[in-house]
């Protein structure tokens, strides 16, 4: 966190040659641990959260106050069958279930080491990769706004993607889910 604190201060101090923007570009830090969240509260314009439950969003909002940005990236599975949805989510989240930094963040939301074992507990999977019909997923999205997110980005998990152990992401976008959840024009 000390390095990030120094980095943000250095970025803020940069003098740009040439035309200056009317408003400086915001600095939004990615981090879900307490130290980086504190740096975001102290020095940044916002915080970027990934795979975090609404409880973490609410905690971040309390820490950052009402005016800073909170971007929540939510992995979703458009499926109404629990077994199918969880199988798809587990394939996509396998990489993150191994990372101690995520374990610590999820522990702050009430999860235990048993929740990270064997592909993740149903409770953890359902929380960090919500699944359901488009109507159910819209309610989940709203719950992130209600918890304090200023922006919610959907990252739907494609059921046919070939997630590889040890790799962070898949290559296929689930366009039908994005279209089903898009606001009406």
Task: Specify the residue positions occupied by each region the protein language model found.
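Active-site-adjacent structural elements that line small-molecule/cofactor binding pockets in enzymes
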Residues: 1-185
């Amino acid at each position: 966190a000390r390095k990030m604190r120094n980095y943000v201060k250095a970025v803020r101090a940069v003098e740009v040659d040439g035309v200056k923007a009317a408003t400086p570009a915001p600095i939004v830090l990615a981090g879900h641990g307490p130290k980086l969240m504190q740096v975001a509260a102290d020095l940044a314009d916002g915080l970027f959260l990934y795979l975090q439950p609404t409880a973490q969003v609410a905690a971040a909002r309390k820490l950052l106050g009402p005016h800073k940005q909170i971007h929540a990236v939510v992995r979703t599975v458009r499926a109404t069958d629990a077994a199918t949805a969880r199988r798809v989510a587990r394939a996509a989240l396998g990489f993150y279930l191994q990372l101690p930094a995520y374990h610590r963040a999820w522990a702050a939301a009430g999860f235990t080491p048993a929740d990270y074992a064997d592909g993740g507990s149903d409770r953890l999977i359902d929380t960090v990769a919500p699944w359901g019909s488009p109507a159910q997923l819209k309610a989940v999205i709203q719950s992130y706004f209600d918890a304090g997110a200023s922006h919610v980005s959907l990252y739907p998990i494609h059921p046919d993607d070939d997630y590889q152990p040890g790799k962070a992401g898949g290559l296929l976008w689930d366009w039908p889910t994005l279209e089903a959840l898009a606001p009406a024009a």
